[in-house]
Amino acid sequence: MTQGESTHDLAVALEPALREACRGSLGDIEWFITAAQRGGAATGASNWTPADSDQPQPVIVKLPVGPAEFAWNTALAGPDRAHASAETPPLPRVIASHTELGGYDLAWIVVERLGPALAPAELTKEDLRAALEVVARFHRDAAEVRPVGPRPQPRDWAGLVDRSRRVIRDRLVHIPDDQRWNEALRKLTKLLPTLTRTWDARPIETWCHGDVHCANIMRRGPDDHEDLALIDLGLVHAGSWIEDALYLERQFWAHPDALHGVKPLQTLARARKALGLDNGEDYAHLAHVRRLLVAGCVPALYADEGSPAYAKAALGWAEKLVKQLA
């Protein structure tokens, strides 16, 4: 039995207790398993009818919910937050939630049911700008409810780049342009001490979403092109705001035309500035450091998450930036 199947069975067994906890407002639940969802939560579609209304609202039910995801969702989009601000939250609105169910220490949430996720093949400039604006609002709101920190443990960039060199040298997987990779990684290795010092000393001023890609950016309605919401908070971490911008950018390395000229780093910087957030000094240089470090890890991770087009784009970044940052 898979983890998804076991949590599905648990959810079905606890459904009567869940509906009782919701005091009759929660309707029948249609449980389903999505291939893209992170973690082992069961997800169900239902309707919510408030005690003072006869108009049902489409909702999504999730259980069990991990501590971090529960805390962020309820803090940023719970009823208390909604009363404190007239602005639409950057996450799905939380309708009901609790950390106990049926006598078990088991967290669950009921949230508004959103429209479709952004479709990469159908993205517009407006979609991308709206997506980065909701990321900026997440940064602002998260910092308001919890101080940012602590500083994360440094990543083993040297170990990953060394593994990349071995993958290319020993041809552990087939990656095109191996000679160019050899040369780019050789130059990168010489720069690593400076690059890692620079990156590890970056300001830690933001709660980063950590997983900003189209499947985690949802429309609030089927035809809503501006009011978006983020989902999947399993990778939220303290870091630099540029990490979210570059994570989204990297999803398009293999097909940059799909960005329609939108530059995620600069667009997120403008959105944050409009909200009064400090972007720091010389973030463009820090972004290049991050791009080069990540590009140098692509061969090491190729077997699990690579593609020829992505590797080609990463090589282009590596060759450009080893010269620029030398």
Locate the predicted segments by residue.
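A cross-family kinase active-site recognition segment
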Residues: S97-H98, L118-E183, P203-E205, H237-A238
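A conserved alpha-helical element in kinase catalytic cores
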Residues: Q57-L106, P120-R137
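Juxta-kinase regulatory segment immediately upstream of eukaryotic protein kinase catalytic domains
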Residues: M1-I33
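Short pocket-lining segment of the protein kinase catalytic domain that shapes the ATP-binding cleft
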Residues: W108-P116
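Active-site activation/catalytic loop segments of kinase-like enzymes and analogous catalytic loops
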Residues: I242-L277, R291-K320
